[in-house]
């Protein structure tokens, strides 16, 4: 009888210990630990080209883009910086977007801090003084077709024409890609400005300002980490310039 009791006690203790080990882990607030919807990223570009525009024309240098983003059920928010390695360029971007099936609607805020002064005017939102560029974007991307159409407009902020009035710079881009094995792909994008805008020096009513051909090669590591490496040929017919750009994307 004593042996039976001891055996029963040992089984009960092991059952309790197993049950305790199966209890979900919690954080310091007592909440159950779950997968995070936050992600980090760092991009590197040897030449900062955006929508065909050369963002650094003087003292050009490679630019690093640290970013944090949150995504959940179609909702996406991000904060991203852009910093030239020679300290001659800085950028701070914030954005929100929502995607439903093939449609994405986004709102972006671009800001370019001073790089030669400890003071700035980030919280100055006066129309004629602010350094913020506020943009709305609509993107259509069919679920079964590797292509997209995006239209953006700077509806407020520092986007002023030669007369000092709001320019409402409008840019449209159509693009697509062709996939190969191992996540390699080649993509083509063509972008155009539809009014006198920041993309053409506020001088042309319509202009094709961005043609980009890009090949992406993805390095895969043993821990399932993937490092996309891209080389893009970019030409801007407005300014008759062309560039070859190397891009490296880290995502965590």
Describe every region a protein language model picked out.
Residues 1-37:
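Cleavable N-terminal export/targeting peptides
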Residues 46, 70-72, 98-100, 109, ...:
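Residue-level signature of outer-membrane beta-barrel architecture
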Residues 42-48, 74-85, 105-113, 120, ...:
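Transmembrane beta-strand segments that form the barrel wall of outer-membrane beta-barrel proteins
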Residues 48-64:
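Surface-exposed strand-loop-strand hairpins of Gram-negative outer-membrane beta-barrel proteins
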Residues 22-23, 213, 219, 240-252:
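Outer-membrane beta-barrel "beta-signal"
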Residues 34-36, 60-64, 71, 88-92, ...:
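Residues that define the transmembrane beta-barrel architecture of outer-membrane proteins
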Residues 22-37, 141-146, 178-187, 218-229, ...:
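Short loop/turn motifs that connect adjacent beta-strands in outer-membrane beta-barrel proteins
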């Amino acid at each position: 009888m004593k042996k039976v009791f001891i055996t029963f006690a040992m089984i009960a203790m092991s059952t309790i210990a197993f049950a305790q080990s199966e209890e979900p882990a919690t954080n310091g607030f007592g909440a159950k630990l779950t997968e995070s919807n936050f992600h980090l990223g760092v991009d590197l570009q040897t030449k900062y080209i955006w929508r065909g525009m050369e963002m650094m024309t003087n003292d050009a240098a490679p630019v690093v883009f640290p970013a944090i983003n949150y995504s959940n059920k179609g909702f996406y928010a991000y904060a991203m910086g852009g910093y030239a390695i020679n300290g001659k360029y800085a950028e701070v971007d914030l954005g929100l977007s929502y995607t439903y099936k093939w449609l994405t609607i986004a709102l972006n805020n671009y800001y370019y801090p001073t790089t030669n002064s400890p003071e700035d005017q980030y919280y100055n939102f006066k129309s004629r003084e602010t350094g913020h560029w506020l943009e709305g974007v609509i993107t259509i991307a069919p679920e079964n077709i590797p292509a997209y159409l995006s239209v953006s407009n700077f509806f407020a902020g520092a986007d002023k024409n030669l007369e000092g009035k709001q320019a409402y710079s409008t840019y449209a881009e159509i693009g697509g890609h062709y996939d190969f094995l191992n996540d390699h792909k080649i993509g083509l994008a063509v972008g155009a400005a539809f009014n006198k805008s920041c993309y053409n020096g506020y001088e042309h009513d319509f202009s094709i300002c961005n043609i980009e051909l890009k090949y992406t090669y993805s390095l895969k590591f043993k821990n399932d980490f993937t490092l996309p490496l891209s080389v893009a040929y970019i030409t801007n017919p407005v300014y008759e310039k062309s560039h070859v750009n190397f891009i490296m994307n880290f995502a965590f």
